[in-house]
Amino acid sequence: MNNIIDVKNLTYKYANSGDKKALDNVSLSIEKGSWTSIVGHNGSGKSTLARSIDGLMSYNEGVINVDGIILSDDTVWDIRKKIGMIFQNPDNQFVGATVEDDVAFGLENLGIETDKMHKIVNNVLKKVRMEDFKERQPDQLSGGQKQRVAIAGVLASKPEIIILDEATSMLDPQGRYEIINLINEIHQENDITVISITHDVSEAMLSDHVIVLNDGKIVESGAPKKVFNDDEMLKLTGLEKPFNAHLFDALVEQGIHPPVELRMDENDLEEWLCQLLLKA
């Protein structure tokens, strides 16, 4: 297994928080090229963890290794070159007067030549399907479109890791669906590691691996179908059951008993129901 991130015994405590720790001796590994969702209720420590990995927050104890580099004051900028972060509020991410200017901003800081910069900007805007909006101002865009521009800005710098810090939580259902599908496309087409910080179980179900945080500690990790099939853990952490599990349980309450292995498999449960209706 080739890990791109290793976190060992990470502890973080906010000032004036007493004995409460936002992160309490957290250790985890993230495989290169994978999509990992870090889930938990508000205050569970998931955003603190993401921002610690990117060097935006100085933790109290522990070690963070990103692609073979130990995070420190001397290496933080080397690590940030490898990571692109997309935050919750798209309005807080715009720094350019237009879409094109915003995507070019990071490239200008890297000293990229103008001709090459234009090619990169056009290419990434096409990838996120925003090439027809490059002269638009931020206030002329929807929330989902702004997040697409933020993703384009991240892709322009060719990161090895993309961290989505609650990046879909302020979007309407359609916008959320479009952004998650876009990230899924980018993940499938490129060797990019994706870390999604979320409390949206349906979003986390698309990932390869799920880590559940509760009160600063990891309480469960594994494949999404395994993790979200644990009703006791979901109750403890205040997370919702996936839609498929809700449907399965509702069928059982009505005296309809699908095979238990279909509880976390939406496509197979749908097919089973279709076959059941055809026999009726």
Curated annotation (Swiss-Prot):
What GO annotations for molecular function exist for this entry?
A: ATP binding; ATP hydrolysis activity; ATPase-coupled transmembrane transporter activity
**GO terms under cellular component:** ATP-binding cassette (ABC) transporter complex
Q: Where is the ABC transporter domain?
A: 5-240
Membrane topology type: Peripheral membrane protein
Q: Which UniProt keywords apply?
A: ATP-binding, Cell membrane, Membrane, Nucleotide-binding, Translocase, Transport
What PROSITE patterns does the record tag this protein with? ABC_TRANSPORTER_1, ABC_TRANSPORTER_2, CBIO
Write out the residues that bind ATP.
40-47
Q: Please tell me whether the keyword Nucleotide-binding is annotated for this protein.
A: yes
Taxonomic superkingdom: Bacteria
Q: Which Pfam families does this one have? A: ABC_tran (PF00005)
The cellular location(s) given in this protein's UniProt record come to: Cell membrane
- State which Enzyme Commission number(s) the record gives: 7.-.-.-
NCBIfam families tied to this protein? ECF_ATPase_1 (TIGR04520), PRK13648.1 (NF010167)
Family under the similarity heading: Belongs to the ABC transporter superfamily. Energy-coupling factor EcfA family.
List the PANTHER family hit by this protein, alphabetically: ENERGY-COUPLING FACTOR TRANSPORTER ATP-BINDING PROTEIN ECFA1, HEAVY METAL TRANSPORTER
Instruction: Report the function annotation for this chain.
Output: ATP-binding (A) component of a common energy-coupling factor (ECF) ABC-transporter complex. Unlike classic ABC transporters this ECF transporter provides the energy necessary to transport a number of different substrates.
Share what the entry says about its subunit structure, partners included: Forms a stable energy-coupling factor (ECF) transporter complex composed of 2 membrane-embedded substrate-binding proteins (S component), 2 ATP-binding proteins (A component) and 2 transmembrane proteins (T component).
Q: What is this protein called?
A: Energy-coupling factor transporter ATP-binding protein EcfA
Q: Please report the organism this UniProt entry assigns to the protein.
A: Pediococcus pentosaceus (strain ATCC 25745 / CCUG 21536 / LMG 10740 / 183-1w)
